[in-house]
């Protein structure tokens, strides 16, 4: 049996389950998950290696009209290189009708030459006939190589999807060593874990006004504890107060929850030191967008 390998980009509207699917496929938590749109800001690269070959997945930010320079960056991240990967996974929600954002995405994908697999997600919350009706509507407007019905949350249909991806990949060597599941640095993943807890614990404009920068990861001498220092950046003083909370309780809760995730990642005890700082209107300033890590890791 020939060994296959290639790159697969996951595209779709915000909050359709792209990150959940990515984590389900590789069997570990690479991308953070939240019920809020635009959780994913960078392309997240994850690797699945099996006897059949190797798939490098790229989970892109959800496609929607940008509202600021950060939004423009995220849209560019989502749409660039669509013709440079081997397969596109176009993820839609089984329980959502086609709307303006989906129409925009359909028009964009219609111009792409890369083979497209339609992935109808969240079949656990609708009747199959509804999911199939949505799929037929999309297939009438877009050339689709294969269609799969899945639940990224509980794993239904995911193994069949992976088999379908391998069928479309070319023969090739492994790009990453066996056992490696991502090529993103630890600092990036730790920052994402902290941001995930902010997404879960805060409301309104706070989640999308936040950037997290990990400044230091250092094992403590004569101890099995790793010291991690990170700064949470917001755009206004009022947001800083919300993140810190009354008597520091919100920041403490964010830190406690994030620490558990980071300890699982690093396999050791963690002392997490969190700070909150203000950078006014950073989402509209190119220099801060770059400084906060919103660039491709090459």
From Swiss-Prot:
Region G3: start-end pairs:
59-62
Q: Where is this region: G5?
A: 150-152
Q: Which domain of life is it from?
A: Bacteria
Q: Where are the transmembrane segments?
A: none
Residue span, Era-type G domain? 4-171
Check the record and name the Gene3D superfamilies matching this protein.
Answer: 3.30.300.20, P-loop containing nucleotide triphosphate hydrolases (3.40.50.300)
| SUPFAM superfamilies to which the protein is assigned, alphabetical | P-loop containing nucleoside triphosphate hydrolases, Prokaryotic type KH domain (KH-domain type II)
- What is this entry's stated membrane topology? Peripheral membrane protein
Localization of this protein: Cytoplasm; Cell membrane
For the region G1, give the residue spans.
12-19
Region G4, as annotated, extends over: 121-124
**GO: which molecular function terms?**
GTP binding; GTPase activity; ribosomal small subunit binding; small ribosomal subunit rRNA binding
Q: Where is the KH type-2 domain?
A: 202-280
Region annotation (G2) ranges: 38-42
Q: Does the keyword rRNA-binding apply?
A: yes
Keyword terms, alphabetized: Cell membrane, Cytoplasm, GTP-binding, Membrane, Nucleotide-binding, Ribosome biogenesis, RNA-binding, rRNA-binding
Supply the Pfam families for this chain: KH_2, MMR_HSR1
Where do the coiled-coil regions begin and end? Answer: none
* Gene Ontology, cellular component aspect: cytosol; plasma membrane
Q: Where does GTP bind?
A: 12-19, 59-63, 121-124
**A Gene Ontology biological process term:** ribosomal small subunit assembly
Could you tell me what this protein does? An essential GTPase that binds both GDP and GTP, with rapid nucleotide exchange. Plays a role in 16S rRNA processing and 30S ribosomal subunit biogenesis and possibly also in cell cycle regulation and energy metabolism.
Q: How does it assemble?
A: Monomer.
Q: Please give the family membership noted in the entry.
A: Belongs to the TRAFAC class TrmE-Era-EngA-EngB-Septin-like GTPase superfamily. Era GTPase family.
The protein here is known as: GTPase Era
Q: Which species is this UniProt entry from?
A: Carboxydothermus hydrogenoformans (strain ATCC BAA-161 / DSM 6008 / Z-2901)
């Amino acid at each position: 049996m020939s060994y296959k390998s290639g790159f697969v980009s996951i595209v779709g509207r915000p909050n359709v389950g792209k990150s959940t699917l990515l984590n389900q496929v590789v069997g570990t938590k690479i991308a953070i998950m939240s019920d809020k749109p635009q959780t994913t800001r960078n392309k997240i690269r994850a690797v699945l290696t099996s006897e059949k070959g190797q798939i490098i997945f790229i989970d892109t930010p959800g496609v929607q009209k940008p509202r600021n320079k950060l939004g423009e960056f995220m849209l560019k991240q989502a749409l660039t290189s669509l013709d440079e990967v081997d397969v596109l996974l176009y993820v839609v929600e089984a329980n959502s009708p086609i709307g303006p954002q989906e129409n925009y995405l359909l028009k964009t994908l219609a111009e792409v030459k890369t083979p497209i697999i339609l992935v109808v997600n969240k079949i656990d919350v609708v009747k199959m006939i509804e999911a199939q009706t949505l799929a037929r509507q999309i297939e009438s407007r877009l050339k689709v190589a294969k269609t799969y019905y899945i639940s990224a949350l509980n794993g239904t249909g995911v193994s069949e999807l992976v088999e379908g991806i391998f069928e479309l990949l070319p023969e090739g060597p492994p790009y990453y060593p066996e056992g490696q599941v991502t090529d993103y640095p630890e600092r990036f993943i730790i920052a994402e874990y902290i941001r995930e807890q902010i997404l879960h614990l805060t409301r309104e404009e706070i989640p999308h006004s936040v950037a997290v920068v990990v400044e230091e990861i250092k094992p403590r001498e004569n101890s099995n504890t790793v010291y991690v220092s990170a700064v949470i950046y917001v755009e206004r003083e009022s947001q800083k107060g919300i993140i810190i909370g009354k008597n520091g309780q919100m920041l403490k809760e964010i830190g406690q929850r994030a620490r558990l995730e980071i300890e699982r990642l690093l396999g050791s005890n963690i002392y997490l030191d969190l700070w909150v700082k203000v950078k006014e209107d950073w989402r509209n300033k190119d220099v801060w967008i770059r400084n906060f890590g919103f660039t491709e890791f090459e």
